[in-house]
Every structure is written in structure tokens, then in C-alpha cells.
Amino acid sequence: MMKGLLKMGLLLTGWAMLLPIVGQEPGTLDTEFQDGGMLLLAPFGASSFENAQDVIALEDGSIVFCGVVGTVGNFEVAVLKLDPEGNLDPAFGVDGAYVFENDLASDQAYSMAALPDGRIVVGGAMGFGGADYSATVWCLLPDGTPDPGFGTEGRFQYTFDDGEEYIRRVLVTDTHITMVATVKVPGFSYDRIGLVQCTHDGVLDQGFGQDGAIIHTIDDTTDLSVRDGERMSNGGIAVCGYHYNMTDNTEYPFIGLFDAAGQPQAGFGNGGIIIADNQPGEYFAMATAGDILYFAGRTNGDVRDFMIDALHTDGTTYTPFAVYGHFELDNALTDLILDLVIDEEGRLLASGTSGIPGFFGDRDFALLRLLPDGTPDPLFGTDGLTTTTFGEAFDDANALVITPENKAVLVGMSAQTNNDFAIARYILGPVIDGVEESVAQFSVYPNPTDNVLHMAHSEHLTEWSIRTPLGQTIEAGALDQSGQMTLGLSHIPSGAYILTLETPHGPQTQRIFVQH
């Protein structure tokens, strides 16, 4: 990951620059998808509530998403597949959907992933009545039918304790499925961290944790509500969420680190857990890039804004990111990040919601893109942010995925009648299918650089400029000859910049990174 930062001497010579065609600006809705890039889907009738919680992309451009359908007190796990145009795939499940019917109680689905052989696993909880929920993974064949060779009747279930247990994230390795869960103390409202691991066939891995699983917290009355988890570069597991402090009635972010065997990371925080008790807020999502961990959610207190923190795997702040490792953005009365991914250039893409707080507040889908240094991408949406409304009600984008065609698909819910599945697809750019090529050829190296930047070009280029991501011009000049030019950048602060070259074919841009 972070390829744009780690690869020295990025060579562009001989490569025809790809320019998006008109209407394909990064951060805009993809008009080739359904109704101008948007889809409201309610295939289970007007009385059903639908809510999409996670999504994966397949190689052919289709997507599969999971969530719940049904009525209050009787929600069922549902998995649906859409073709690249956004239509239900009739060859998947029954008319494009698999629904797990359980008459005992409601079920929940929060996370999904693809196994190496194309099977799909969905993590959540199966209800047995009252407060009895067991951590459950459903496994489907590529055609949307349960895998009879996985666990019992296509399900793996694990009971941590006698209370409510919900899998929040399924993490797939070459041989195992690791589940990150919230585990409640029976009879109490305290949450704890739960980890459990099984094979790709749904068999408990007895060598993980303590006989296959672990429940972990700081003490019996410390509430730790888990919301996400990721594998780290060292094979360990990072989890995040929020701690509810009953003394001041405030949530605070927390992170927990475990080794690959499911044991708390020695020397990290308090038994492998750090609570940011000086920073009110909540983590709902995380992503990793090399040895850097990114945690996202919202601030808490008088304002609730988009928030992302960057840390090293030892818990120290990754200071080159944003403002001393911390990013905040105030767009509306309430702003919340619910999912986070990192693209191949090291940029952060976050989905969530923005608008008026409260159950009936008018909120919109939100899609945010940051450069690797934690500044909003000025070439994306409006100052790095795009919002999309499905109507005058709340629209929450619970998850996103980047497709092989370099498009972002956001899934969630929209409360227009009852809650409906809400899906939107956006252009990220450049678009590989349907591009205009320019014959301008040049190279920029080394990139990143700590001192000088060389520009080699094959034709007459008239002007150049270096701007900050927010558009402030740092340097500018004229190019009066073809060949090569060297710029001294030792006086420019470390960070990401936009290099623009004026050519007979129009302006060409390239991100450059200065690292002193």
C-alpha cells in the first residue's frame, strides 16, 4: 500500500497521459449506473425495512452487499448481487438475493468478504430470542446458495458468553477467517472485545486465542464497543470502537492490538488497549497502509465532525498526517465516517453521512477523499467532499468499495418510506474505459523528493506551477525549451503538492511529494 509514496523515481516517460472525458470528473456520480448514479432498492415489499451494511466488488464489475430486511422484531440477514449496471442478478440466490429465514428472533449482518475460491462469507449474529445472540458467519457459494461444506448447514457459530454477541468484521487470510466481535456482559450493558477464528471450512481454530477465541477488556466495568478491525502488516489484528464513560456520559475512541495468535500485544497501552480519554469521539472504521493505522469516525461533544487519526503500530502518532496525525472536517451539524479504504495511490476514501442529527434528521450520503498527507483532495468533488441526497430524510452510507473499474460504490439505507437499500456509484478517475489520450510525454523524478525535482519532456511546454492541495500557488515559472528542467524544492515544506504543466494539448497535472 501507499504505492505513490514508496516508489522512488515515478517514471511517466512514454506513457500517454489519460484524461477523463467530459462528465467524468472525480467525485461525481457515475451516470452509467441506474438513475444518474443512484439506486433505491426495496425488493421485499412496501412493509419491509432494508439496510445495507457492507459491500464487496467482483472482477466483472458486479457488487455483492449484505444487510438486513424485514420488520421490527423480525429482521433477516440478506445478501444481494447487482450486475455492473445495478440490476439484480437473477442467477444469484432467488431472483438476485439470499435471505436467511429465522423464526426465533431477528438476525444481523455487519461485514462480508470473499474467500480465495470465490465463496462469500458474511459476519453478524443469529438471534435465539430475547438477548440471546450468537456470533455467526454465513458462507455462500458464488451462486448465492449456502455452502453445505461450511460449518453446520453453511454457518459457523460461536458462543463467547450467554449474552449478546455480534461480529463486526470478518478478516480473511489464505487459510483462516478471523472474526472481530462485540461481546456484552450477560445481564449488563458493558461491551467487550471478542476475537474468534475458524478455517475456510468453518472449523474452529483451536490454536487461536484460548481454544479458538478470546474475550478481552481492561476490567469488569470498562465498556468497549467494537466497531471495526483489520489485519496489520505484521499479521496482528487491530480493533477499534468507542468507550462509554458512565461518569461524564461521554464516548471516547479506543484501539486494541493483538498478535496473529489472538493475544493482546505486549507493551501496548493497558493490556493491549488504549482509550483516548482526552479526545471525545467514536471510531467506526479503520484501514491500514504498511505500518500506519488509520481510524475514522466522528468527534463528540458540542460538535460532531468527520474525524480521522493516524498512528504507528506502537500507538505513537503518525505526525506527517494532517495536523499532527489528526484530521477533522466540519461540513454540517453532524458528520460521521462509517467506512474507510485506501486506494493504490495511498489516498484515503471515507463514506458516511452528513446533515441534521437525530433519527428523523435530513442527512445525505457523504464521500470524502484525502491525499496521503491528510489534506482534502482538491481534484475530488468540492474540496475533497461529495454529498448525495436520495430525498428529504436520512441517507446513511454504511460501507464502500472501490471496483476494478476505479469507481466507488457506496451502500446503506435511505428513509424515504420505510428504510430502503440505497446504493450510489461515483467516478474516482482516471476512467480506464472511455478515455482520451494525449501525446504529451514527460517524466517527473524522483517522486517523492527531498531536494530537487527533475522534469524531462519531449516537446515544448510553456508554463509550470506547483500548488498546495487547496490551490495556493507555491512556485511558478516558464519553460522556454524542450528537454529537461530541474527545480529546487529544499525550501518547500514536506507535504503533497500538485505540479501542473501547460502543454499544447492543455494542462497536465501530477501529484508530487516532498519529504525532508
Question: What residues fall within each predicted segment?
Answer:
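C-terminal tail/sorting-segment detector
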Residues: 494-516
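Short, glycine-anchored, charge-dense loop/turn motifs used at functional sites
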Residues: 466-474, 497
